[in-house]
C-alpha cells in the first residue's frame, strides 16, 4: 500500500485516462501508475472553507484533477452546512456537535439568553413545528401529539438563524450561539446522570477538548461546512462513470446523487454502495 498525494492530472492516452502520476509522502518519490481505469475517491471540499467538520485531506484535489482531465463538474454551489460545530478553542473549531443534543432537548440561545429559534419558522414547517417551549419539550419526551421544537428544523434553516443572530450582534463571543442541554435540570430530577447517559460522547468531547461541562453550562456552537452535494459529473445509472472514458468517481467527490440538500445519513449508504462497486 502506498500513501500518496495527487500531483498533476490523471494521465491520458488520447481521450481516455490510462493511469495516474502520484507523490509518495513517506519516501518523497514520484510514482507512475499505468491502468485501464482510475477511480477517484478523494472526498469533498470542506477544507476550502475556514470552518469545517471535514478531515484535513478534503481539499477538493479530486475535483481539480478530474476537471483538468476534461471531466465536468456539477452543482458545486450546493454546499451543506451543519448548524452545530464547536466554536472554541481554535484547535477544535468546526468539529461536529451531534444533532442528538437538540434531539434530547438542547435549545439554542443568543448572547441575551433568548431562545431565538421560535422567532422565524418557515411557512412550510409551521404546521409541524411547536408553538411553545412546553410543546417542544413534550415532543422530546415522546408525546406523539406534540410537534417538534424549532431547533430540529432543517440544517440550512438552523444555520441561517445562527448566522443572523451573529450578524445582528447577538452571537456568542466566538461567532456562534449557545446550545444548552443543561437547562433540562428544570424538567428532569437527576439531569446530570441523564445527560451523561444520553450524550456520553458529547460530554467527553466538550470536557476534554474545550473544558466545558455540558451538564452545567452551555456549549458554544456555529455553522460548519459539512458536505458538498456537487462534484464530478457521473452517469445517472452507475453514479460512477464520469464524462471521461476510464475515469470514475465514488463517494462525495461524485456529484448529483443527493440533489440540492443531502438527507442526513445518506452519504454513508452512498460511499458504501458505490465504493463497493468501484
Placement of each model-derived feature along the sequence:
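Glycine-rich loop(s) and the adjacent beta-strand/alpha-helix scaffold that form part
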Residues: 37-95, 127, 266-277
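An anion/pyrophosphate-binding glycine-rich loop and adjacent beta-alpha core
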Residues: 72-208
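Core beta-strand elements of the Rossmann-like FAD/NAD(P) dinucleotide-binding domain
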Residues: 26-37, 242-246
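Glycine-/small-residue-rich beta->alpha transition segments that form the dinucleotide
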Residues: 26, 35-37, 41-46, 210, ...
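Catalytic phosphate/nucleotide-handling subdomain of diverse soluble enzymes
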Residues: 242-278
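Conserved redox-cofactor binding core of oxidoreductases
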Residues: 1-29, 41, 85-89, 94, ...
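A glycine-rich dinucleotide-binding beta-alpha-beta segment and adjacent secondary-structure elements
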Residues: 1-16, 23, 194-256
